[in-house]
């Protein structure tokens, strides 16, 4: 089954009456419809001939090219939408993919977004995030209960342009003139009074309506270019309105592809895309975004409204060539709804990239209402057009200077000029908050160059470099990976010259750090990547600890120029921790959407069907990771099979919610590690029931397409294979409920149960309800039964098994059970069973185990997404186990220098040597000719910087001096009065003189007694 794209229009509103919108999205493959992509642009007739020739030779007759009525029809295109009878579909696909001019064939997708609006008369402080999407108003009232008490009210600015000082650039004559901006949204009315330069409106939905029936497109356009009431940033920009969603909130992938092609034909400069979804593997969409930016279009996209959960970035904002925007409030706090990084494309073998790129205001922002006037909205789909409007303004100013702007140079300037928010990590804020004026100054002095994102790597810097700064490096540890984006402002295409070079600083013990570098050989469009694996050298002295430093040197050839750029790097090293304090996290056996339908772990959460947060310790298991670190444990991530780690280094292997199969070699390896090396294995599973999987499959009435899960919450049959050597197995029933263990309350959410366990082991049972029967329409009584859910077994090592992982997962967590993992770690560390596990012990009749054993779903499609199995003519077979990753050290040149403290700060871009900025007035004068700055503006600025500012400074200094003199006078006066009283003198000149002498002598005796030097 092909990857399904889930695209949502990220829309969160808090209007003048503070409307709260709940947004959901669904995406389905359209049955019997395929997008045929060609290797170039061809006219309609030519494309028809190519498809006809390919299908004619295969004997496929029942097919047709679907007509697309839109503004792009008159131009050549690089794709067609093809309908093929289901009977011939496999034949047709084979024939088409074999044609020399056909690049690929992918399913057509339908995207639907649902908005359910509730009006609330008071400001709603709880902003939309993934856990509450689609919930009813009762849940919102429950979430809002903490705001029933008094709290400080804050003023919300009425003009976002004033906050970001766009008016300063307006006074320079910079208003967006000459810049074409494409807005992909819900349309715009032609008669709306806020807009004066709507160059073109196009409808891509096929229903012939150009107006905005929802209001979102109007608001977005207003932030970019409104010229009255609630002002936009670039009122003179030329707006190109692309209506890509119907009023029923439906769209198709092909609509976007056509609209993107048209935007390229129209040579737009900037494109705002306030949509997104988790499917970064929808290749036609991703490819077309690359093509857009390769043609010089600066794309700004919302990062998503799925925060505060980590690993929730949306595509295309997570692409390297796109400016991904997160949201903040007006008090400069990260908005709760704003999606967090890291990217998850690179997992499990690699590590995610830094995203979002930048943040801006996205909470309670004023903008244009569909009916005229202004309203407020919140969401990253608001922050995105704020940045898009700012970029439009910047582009018009730079083009007026006769300079060139491209997607990379604009991104470099935004990142280098941003203001970092204190106490916020890089996966929340990116490079920081948008600074419009600083960005303009950077662009004004910009010269084409190559830069990094992040611009330096300091694994000792907390909080910004979280999670790297939370755990030092040590010998025998699994390499830590830092994934850096390379931005190429020289040209759309570049390539790496020679190889990157690691340059350790000898004065900072950089030679104790082993560095492995993998990188993209080519940079296209405008960007590439460099993955840095860091480990500790075996040459390091025993028990040595300290910081190490150096830099990585990379040379790029682009636009007939070789450009060398350095990435400063610093890390902390400690001696290896005790084995029992080291935990190995199994990432290799976690699978998620995309590409397949991997269902949710908690079946009670019906509005969130996909498991798409990567199940990583730095995404949806962030809370667990922080708890383990604060408890003194060191957590390492295994992105390879079990055959690739040394069990003698670790106290426990942690297997949480695995969906992948296990190699037979892995099962043998774990058995050996437990028996010979005392390794302990801790497993937290989830549900698996074939009937429930069939019950929760999707069926779309429009597309007539079934979407079947490829596994359950966990792959229980695979876990049973892993545990079979010990006589341990898990069952197919699904249970839920709430129970107590000791003085702790525990939520059990769609978990499995233990069906067999060694007699010498300990099994804990709790009273729960059968959720599987309820879902399947059986038991509606809510009857509770005793269910064995926790097993503890000791051989040479320990095996601990629990049936539900939701209490460790930040996604939909109700009450965490971190304490349970603490108790398990205490058990495997000391051998002493915590008292809390001695309650409700039961014995399991292993004779009945086979009755409850889970069976694999017949004809499931796990093999399409698995790294372990594949489908052959004889059935499902195991793939050869991959080789372990070897550490190939980077080319190294030791430098006899020390690190500069400025290296480990945001790196500045190189500037034009002719650009000499002495102060603001000189800077304005240098722009006067090209920016048409009026003499009045210069006079005002000159007066302020040349006369008013120094006078004001002098007045402040004199005021401070006067206050100090008065304070000293009153102090002496008080002491003089004390002296008169002590001497019994009157207020005469002689009396005052004697009183001062008395005070001086008295103070001198006291100070001498204290040893002061008088």
Language model regions located:
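Substrate-binding/access-modulating region of protease and related hydrolase catalytic domains
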Residues: 45-46, 50, 175-177, 227, ...
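Surface-exposed binding patches on compact interaction domains or structured appendages
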Residues: 448-468, 489-535
């Amino acid at each position: 089954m092909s990857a399904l794209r889930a695209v949502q229009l990220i829309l969160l509103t808090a209007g003048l009456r503070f409307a709260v919108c709940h947004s959901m999205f669904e995406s389905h493959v359209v049955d019997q419809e395929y997008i045929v992509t060609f290797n170039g642009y061809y006219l309609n007739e030519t494309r028809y001939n190519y498809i006809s020739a390919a299908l004619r030779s295969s004997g496929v007759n029942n097919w047709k090219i679907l007509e697309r009525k839109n503004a792009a029809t008159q131009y050549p295109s690089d794709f067609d939408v093809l309908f093929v009878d289901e009977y011939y579909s496999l034949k047709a696909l084979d024939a088409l993919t074999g044609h020399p001019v056909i690049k690929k064939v992918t399913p057509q997708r339908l995207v639907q977004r649902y908005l359910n609006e509730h009006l609330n008369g008071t400001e709603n402080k709880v902003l939309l995030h993934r856990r509450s999407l689609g919930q009813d108003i009762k849940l919102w009232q429950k979430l809002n209960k903490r705001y029933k008490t008094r709290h400080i009210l804050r003023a919300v600015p009425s003009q976002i342009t004033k906050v970001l000082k766009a008016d300063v650039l307006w006074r320079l004559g910079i208003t967006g003139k000459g810049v074409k901006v494409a807005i992909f949204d819900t349309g715009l009315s032609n008669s709306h009074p806020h807009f004066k330069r709507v160059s073109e409106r196009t409808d891509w939905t096929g229903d012939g309506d150009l107006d905005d029936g929802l209001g979102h497109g109007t608001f977005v356009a207003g932030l970019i270019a409104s010229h009255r009431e609630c002002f936009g940033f670039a009122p003179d920009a030329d707006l190109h309105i692309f209506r890509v969603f119907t009023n029923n909130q439906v769209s198709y992938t092909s609509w976007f592809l056509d609209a993107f092609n048209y935007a390229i034909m129209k040579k737009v400069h900037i494109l705002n895309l306030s949509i997104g979804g988790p499917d970064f593997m929808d290749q036609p969409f991703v490819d077309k975004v690359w093509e857009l930016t390769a043609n010089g279009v600066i794309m700004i996209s919302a990062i998503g409204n799925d925060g505060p959960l980590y690993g929730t970035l949306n595509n295309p904002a997570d692409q390297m060539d796109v400016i991904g925007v997160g949201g903040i409030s007006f008090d400069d706090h990260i908005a709760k709804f704003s999606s967090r990084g890291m990217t998850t494309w690179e997992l499990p073998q690699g590590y995610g990239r830094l995203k979002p790129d930048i943040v801006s205001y996205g909470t309670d922002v004023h903008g244009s209402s569909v009916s005229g006037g202004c309203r407020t909205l919140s969401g990253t789909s608001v922050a995105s057009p704020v940045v898009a409007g700012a970029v439009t303004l910047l582009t018009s100013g730079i083009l007026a200077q006769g300079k060139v702007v491209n997607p990379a140079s604009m991104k470099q300037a935004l990142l280098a000029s941003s203001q970092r928010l204190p106490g916020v990590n890089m996966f929340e804020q990116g490079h920081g908050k948008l600074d419009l004026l600083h960005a303009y100054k950077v662009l004004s002095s910009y010269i084409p160059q190559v830069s990094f994102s992040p611009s330096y790597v300091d694994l000792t810097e907390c909080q910004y470099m979280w999670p790297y700064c939370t755990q030092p490096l040590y010998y025998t540890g699994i390499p830590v990976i830092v994934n850096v984006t390379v931005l190429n402002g020289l040209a759309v295409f570049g390539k790496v010259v020679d190889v990157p070079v690691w340059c350790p600083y000898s004065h900072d013990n950089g030679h104790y750090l082993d560095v492995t570098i993998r990188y993209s050989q080519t940079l296209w469009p405008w960007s590439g990547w460099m993955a840095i694996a860091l480990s500790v050298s075996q040459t390091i002295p025993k028990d040595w600890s300290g910081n190490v430093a150096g830099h990585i040197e990379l040379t790029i050839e682009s636009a007939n120029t070789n450009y060398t750029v350095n990435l400063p790097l610093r890390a902390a090293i400690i001696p290896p921790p005790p084995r029992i304090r080291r935990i190995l996290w199994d990432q290799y056996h976690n699978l998620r959407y995309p590409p397949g339908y991997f269902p949710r772990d908690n079946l009670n959460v019906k509005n969130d069907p996909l498991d798409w947060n990567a199940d990583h310790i730095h995404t949806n298991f962030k809370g667990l990771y922080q708890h383990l670190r604060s408890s003194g444990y060191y957590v390492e991530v295994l992105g390879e099979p079990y055959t690739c780690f040394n069990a003698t280094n670790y106290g426990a292997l942690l297997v949480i919610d695995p969906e992948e199969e296990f190699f037979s070699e892995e099962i043998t390896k774990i058995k050996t590690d437990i028996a010979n090396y005392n390794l302990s294995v801790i497993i937290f599973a989830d549900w698996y029931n074939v009937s429930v999987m069939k019950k929760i499959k999707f069926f779309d009435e429009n597309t007539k397409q079934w979407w079947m899960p490829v596994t359950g919450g966990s792959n229980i049959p695979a876990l049973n294979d892993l545990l079979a050597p010990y006589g341990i197995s898990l069952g197919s029933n699904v249970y839920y409920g709430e129970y107590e263990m000791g003085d702790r309350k525990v939520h059990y959410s769609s978990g499995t149960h233990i069906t067999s366990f060694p007699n010498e082991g300990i099994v804990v049972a709790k009273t729960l309800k059968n959720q599987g029967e309820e879902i399947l329409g059986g038991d509606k009584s809510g009857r509770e039964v005793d269910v064995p859910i926790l097993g503890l077994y000791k051989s040479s090592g320990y095996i601990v098994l629990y049936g539900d992982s939701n209490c460790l997962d930040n996604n939909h967590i109700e009450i965490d059970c971190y304490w349970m993992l603490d108790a398990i770690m205490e058990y495997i560390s000391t051998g002493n069973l915590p008292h809390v596990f001695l309650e409700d012990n039961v014995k399991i009749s292993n004779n009945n185990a086979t009755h409850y054993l889970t069976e694999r779903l017949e004809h499931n499609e796990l093999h399409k997404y698995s790294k372990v199995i594949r489908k052959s003519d004889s059935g499902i077979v195991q793939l050869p186990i991959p080789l372990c990753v070897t550490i190939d050290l980077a080319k190294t040149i030791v430098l006899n220098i020390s690190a500069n403290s400025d290296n480990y700060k945001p790196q500045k871009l190189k500037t034009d040597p002719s650009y000499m900025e002495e102060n603001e007035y000189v800077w304005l004068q240098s722009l006067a000719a090209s920016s048409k700055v009026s003499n009045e503006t210069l006079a005002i600025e000159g007066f302020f910087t040349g006369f008013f500012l120094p006078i004001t400074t002098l007045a402040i200094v004199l005021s401070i001096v006067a206050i100090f003199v008065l304070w000293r006078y009153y102090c002496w006066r008080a002491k003089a009065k004390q002296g008169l009283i002590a001497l019994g003198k009157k207020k005469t000149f002689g009396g005052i003189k004697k009183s001062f002498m008395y005070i001086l002598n008295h103070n001198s005796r006291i100070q001498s007694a204290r040893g002061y030097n008088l």
